[in-house]
Amino acid sequence: MEKSSYTPNVFIFTRYYLPGFRAGGPIRSISNLVYHLERYIDFHIVTSDRDMGLSRHYNEVCLDTWIRNSENEVIYLSRLFFGFNLLSLILRNRKKSKVLYFNSFWDPMFTILPLIISKIFLNNCKVIIAPRGEFLDGALGVKRLKKNFYLWFFRSLGFVNNVVWHTTSYDECDAIRKLFKIDSNSIFQISNFSRIADKDIMKKGFLSGDTLRIVFLSRISPKKNLAFALSIISRLEFPTIFNIYGVIDDVEYWNYCQKLISQMNNHVIVIYHGSVDNRFVLDIFSDNDVFFLPTKSENFGHAIVESLLAGTPVLLSDKTPWRNLSSFGVGWDLPLNSDEVFLSTLNSYYSDLINGVSISRYNISQWINNRINHQYLINDYIMLFSQN
């Protein structure tokens, strides 16, 4: 199937997009989706003029005008007169806007405002919302009062009956059903696309001498649970390097993590590398022996997939969609209420590596590639974006 006169025009509203990278998963969700589907669907991406947490806009892009990029186009809206520019954009594209896709539920600028404008000025357009894990228990409890008000507002304006939901996990499907008291007909559960790893990555070995290299690559916030990882690593009795990558979301939390880092034994080295461009993520994972992410809540986990694509095992909490990993030989998913299980798992893994137990990056990468069948995903997404 290629583009035709029936090809849907899909307007994607997302606060962060390429060339940004600091927001992590949400950017990769959309950029991978566009990459795999641009032969079949006309995408028009509406995004902000800067990366997450930065006060300056991108220098390398023109603002407030459509920029053609391969088979799709992007507009970076400046903060000055944002509301006016957004209204003008929607009105100018009324005839073209057949499908609207929102890459968040709570975003005031790139979901709530355009959703209200579209309800007033657009007729017969399909509205799709991708909450990206925002309804899971660990995420819904943050800023609960403000979120409850918007949920009331959302229901009062009758949006519930006119929205299609896109989720990537059964847990979020279930959360949406319970929260809005709807059936499954308006919910599409479709996994995210992944990238393809370079074959040279598969040739990298494990361990650096007798040192275990552990990596944490995620936003630094209580939800991602870096402090828990540090508390486990502080108890390891063998040479360890713990590489931390990610944007600091919560400065107070990071200060607490730094206190934990300062108390590490001499044989444990902790290095904070800052945020990382998505282009280098697979290489970073392949340079480490295990990805440690004891997250309190995860909807999909792009970093988890990318670690597996690089052939690096993952040590996760049981709060992600990726379960029973040890039975496939690609990692572990463990309960957060048991520090000892995490500690013993790292000890056993290190012992296996030291004793020469064979671990194949290629086999790990093949496992995740088999789990994510891109052609099936393409067909599912075409159905999601169809105008019927």
Descriptions of predicted regions:
Residues 147-166:
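Membrane-proximal helix-turn-helix segments that form the acceptor-binding/catalytic region
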Residues 28-32, 212, 216-235, 252-255:
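A conserved mid-protein helix/loop that constitutes part of the nucleotide-sugar donor-binding site
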Residues 313-317:
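Short hydrophobic beta-strand element within catalytic cores of glycosyltransferases
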Residues 296:
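Aromatic "clamp/platform" in nucleotide-sugar-dependent glycosyltransferases that forms part
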Residues 16-18, 36-81:
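N-terminal strand-loop element at the rim of the active site
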Residues 354-388:
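A charged, aromatic-enriched C-terminal amphipathic alpha-helix characteristic of glycosyltransferases
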Residues 275-276, 283-288:
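Short alpha-helical donor nucleotide-sugar binding micro-motif in glycosyltransferases
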Residues 49-52, 217, 241-258, 272-274:
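Glycosyltransferase donor-sugar binding loop
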